[in-house]
Amino acid sequence: MEKTIYHGSDHIIEKPKFGYGKPYNDYGIGFYCTQNPNMAKEWGVGIDHNGYANRYEIECDGLTILDLNAPGYTMLHWLTILLENREFDTSAPLAAEAKEYLMNTFHLDYKSADIIIGYRAEDSYFSFASDFINGAISYRQLCNAMRLGKLGQQFVLKSKAAFEQLEFLGYETADSKEWYKKKAFRDQTARRQYLDVERNRRQRGDLYITTILDEEMKPDDPRLR
């Protein structure tokens, strides 16, 4: 099964290097792509520089794909991977306890996957996750918040085997004046919707991290689906 994917960057990348990148990205070191060319253009531009949506084709047959949106996983599986790779402020006792419990209970062997598909935690979305482990929002609110702004999914190449199946097809240029404005608007929209619609809209019966900890909830709990 072949898929077309895009990588947003400030330069053209004909041959991505395996093992190159920042270890503190959402899923650790990897080549971060999307199946949406417009999203790649937003990711590639900066306020003062143009960008590129590098286009590739990848043959997925024979590769192990961890799709965090599949029915067998919950938002807490995604959050646990994020906690392992990103720097969260867990100085508060609740956040520290939440991190420890999630790491012990919802940890996945994601490093053995060739490809990971899941949410991208840009600044706004990272703050949503932080609010959850600090008890400021419920699990329902977290799940809803991750869909604000329609950020979409990342398609991340993690293994050498995945890199070997990648073929460069070309690139599309992204003008900073056009695409940075769209990028900023998407982020601002997500923040505004979060504050207006989600953060202060508690519902009776909402599930908070304190309940998850107190009841020692497990991944198969139907309340997490």
Model-inferred region functions:
Residues 1-26, 46, 54, 219-225:
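ADP-ribose/NAD+-binding catalytic cleft of ART/PARP-like enzymes
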Residues 4, 31, 53-54, 154-155:
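A broad, low-specificity signal marking well-ordered, structured residues that form hydrophobic/aromatic
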Residues 10-11, 37, 60-62:
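Short, flexible loop/turn elements at secondary-structure junctions
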Residues 22-47:
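Extended catalytic/binding region for NAD+/ADP-ribose chemistry, centered on the ART fold
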Residues 42-58:
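Compositionally biased, low-complexity linear motifs
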Residues 47-49, 60-225:
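Conserved NAD+-utilizing ADP-ribose enzyme module
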